[in-house]
Amino acid sequence: MAIVGLFYGSDTGNTENIAKQIQKQLGSDLIDIRDIAKSSKEDIEAYDFLLFGIPTWYYGEAQADWDDFFPTLEEIDFTDKLVGIFGCGDQEDYADYFCDAIGTVRDIIEPHGAIVVGNWPTEGYNFEASKALLEDGTFIGLCIDEDRQPELTAERVEKWCKQIYDEMCLAELA
């Protein structure tokens, strides 16, 4: 078993593709990828280092498989677990809800002890509002817009992976 569990939900394949890019960047020896639709509470509890991939749909809605899993997520003790969150959204058509689902996940796991890592700058994005925003003006995790900025995805994923690698101290564990 790898030391980082990456759990994602995806309807169109965009978030799944990002998950695979992250695994490629960080290494399959470090990252296990799992579809949240086929995952259990015990699957998540098995890891101290987690990455959650969740797209935002329409007016701030979570992807359906994640939405179904939220009650289970609320039962998990995340004390001392490091969690990075990434997701896809559309900053133009849904500018008032850009990557809201990332913020929704944070709102569920932080009260249960999660240490969320991987804050991401908002520079280069054009949106109105997001539940993923922190008080310091950064996103709580990596926001990807495959609809409007697909040409920036590879670079953003690469930079975020380097950041996650450092913040989770994965070099010391590999």
Swiss-Prot record:
InterPro entries in the cross-refs: Flavodoxin (IPR050619), Flavodoxin/NO_synth (IPR008254), Flavodoxin_CS (IPR001226), Flavodoxin_lc (IPR010086), Flavoprotein-like_sf (IPR029039)
Gene Ontology MF: a single term: FMN binding
Disulfide bonds: none
UniProt domain Flavodoxin-like: residue ranges: 4-165
Organism: Haemophilus influenzae (strain ATCC 51907 / DSM 11121 / KW20 / Rd)
Reported function: Low-potential electron donor to a number of redox enzymes.
UniProt keywords, alphabetically: Electron transport, Flavoprotein, FMN, Transport
Cofactor dependency: FMN
Family, per entry: Belongs to the flavodoxin family.
PROSITE patterns assigned to the protein according to its UniProt record, in alphabetical order: FLAVODOXIN, FLAVODOXIN_LIKE
Source domain of life: Bacteria
Recorded name of the encoding gene: fldA
Protein name: Flavodoxin
